[in-house]
From Swiss-Prot:
Family: Belongs to the sodium:galactoside symporter (TC 2.A.2) family.
Expression triggers: Expression is negatively regulated by XylR and is subject to CcpA-dependent catabolite repression.
A molecular-function term among this protein's GO annotations: carbohydrate transmembrane transporter activity
Higher taxonomy: Bacteria, Bacillati, Bacillota, Bacilli, Lactobacillales
Identification of the protein by name: Isoprimeverose transporter
GO process annotations (BP): carbohydrate transmembrane transport; sodium ion transport
Membrane protein topology class: Multi-pass membrane protein
Species for this entry: Lactiplantibacillus pentosus (Lactobacillus pentosus)
Job of this protein: Involved in the metabolism of isoprimeverose. Transports isoprimeverose into the cell. Transport is driven by the proton motive force generated by malolactic fermentation. Cannot transport D-xylose.
Disrupted gene: phenotype observed: XylP-xylQ double mutant retains the ability to ferment xylose but is impaired in its ability to ferment isoprimeverose.
Amino acid sequence: MSVSMQHHSSEASPATQPASVIHKNMVPWSERFSYSLSDFACNLSFSLVSTYLMFFYTDVFGISAAIVGTLFLVARIVDAFDGPFWGIMIDHTHTRWGKSRPYWLWFAIPFAVFSVLCFTVPNMSTGMKVVWAYVTYIGVDVLYSAVNIPITSILPSLTSNPQERVTLSTIRQFMGTLGATIISTIALPLVAYFGGGSTSSAHGWFMVALIMAVIAMVIFFIVFANTKERVQTVQSKKSIPIKTSLKALKRNWPWVIVIFINFIYWLGMQTRSQVTVYFFKYNMHDATLASFILGLQLVALLAVVITPWTAKRIGKRNTMLMGMLLAIVGQLILWGGSKALNVPTITVGTIVGYLGTGFVSGLIAVMLADSVDYGEWKNGVRAEGIVTSFSSFSAKFGMGIGGAVTGLILSAGGYVANHAQSAQALNAIEMNYVWVPIVGFGLSAIALLFYKVDKIEPKMLADLEQKHAQENALADDQK
C-alpha cells in the first residue's frame, strides 16, 4: 500500500539541509509555544474522556461498570489498527504543509464533534445507549489518534538537535499537564454549575464537553498555522512502502522498551485517574476532594520544567527512572494517609507522586524521537510516522486495558452506583487507585534498566549527520 497526497502551491517545502546546519538552528519561541499548545488542546477534551467517562457512563448515562470495562477493552482492539494506520498515513503524506501538520487541519473538527457526542445522553433504550456509547467512544478514540500522533511524529522534523527536542517536549508536556489539570479541576464544578448543582446532570456534562471541544478545535488550527517541518532528509521526501517502514522497527530495542513503558505506565495511571471520584466519594466520604486532588497535577509542572536540566546532567534514562521511583513512594504515602482518613498525608503523597510522573511524561516523546534516529542508524530506514504512531497506540492501549481492569475490579468487588459500598467494593476502589499504579510504575522502572541509548547517542548522531550529508550531496549531483 502506498498513499501519496501531493499538493503544490506557493508555500514552499523546507529545503533539505545537512544535519550540521540543522543543529545550529533553534526552534523560535513562538513556534515552541504553538507546538506545546497541541498537547494542551488534546488534554482539554481527551482528559475529560479519560478521567470522567467511566463515572459519566455508570452514574449519569446509566450503564454498568462491567459493560463499560468491556467497551474499553473492545476499543483497544480497534486501537491495535488505528495507531499504526495513522502512522502509515503520515509516512505516505506529502503536502505543501509537510507530513504531520495537515492532520491538525483535517481532523480538528471531527475530533471536536465526537468529543461532545461522548457526553451526550440520547433518549434511547438501554441497549441502544450501549450501541451509542460504542460508536461515540471508539469514534473519539480513533480521531484522537489522528490529532495526537502528529504531535510526536512531527518532533523529529522540528529539529534534529537532541537538547532542543528535550526543550520542545518539556514545554509541550508543561502545557499538556496544564490542560489536564485545568479540566480535572474545573470539570465537576462546571458540571454542577450548568446542571443546577448536580455533578450527575446530563446537561451539565454536555455543556462542559461542548465548551472544551470548541476551545480545543480552535487551538489545533493555531498549532497548524504556526509550526514548520524543517528537518527533511532525502528519504523523508519519498513515500516509503509499508514493508520498508516496518524495517525501522527491526532490532530497535530502545523503541520496544519505550513502547512497553508507555503501555504499562498509562495502564496504571488510568486505573488511578478513573476511580479518583469514586475513591473520594466512597472511601474518603467527600467527593469534593476529588477536584482538589486532581488539581495538584500542577506540581508536576515543576518536574517538567527541570527535566531538561536533569536529563542533561544525569541522562534521560536516569531522570525517568527517578520519576518512576518517586511515583511509587508517593502512592505508598497516599495509601498510608487513606487508611487513617488523613487528607494532609494523602495530599503529600499525591504531590510526591505527581512530581515523579512529571519527569516521566516529559521524556517519553523525546525517547521515541531518539528511537526514530536509532531505527535509521541501525536499519537505514527513517519512518517517523510508523515508529511514533505506536506511542499513541501503546498509551491508549494501556489506558484502555486500565479502563477494562478498573471496570472488572469494580464489578468483582460488587460496586453499585450511588449506594453505600460494601467493604469488598471499597477494597476494589483502593486496588485501582493505589496498587495497580504501583505495579505499573515498578515494571516500567525495571524496563528502564535495559535502555542504553544515552550512552551511544553521540556516535549515533554523528553517523547520521555524515549519512545525511552524503545523501544530500548525491541528490544535488543528480539535479
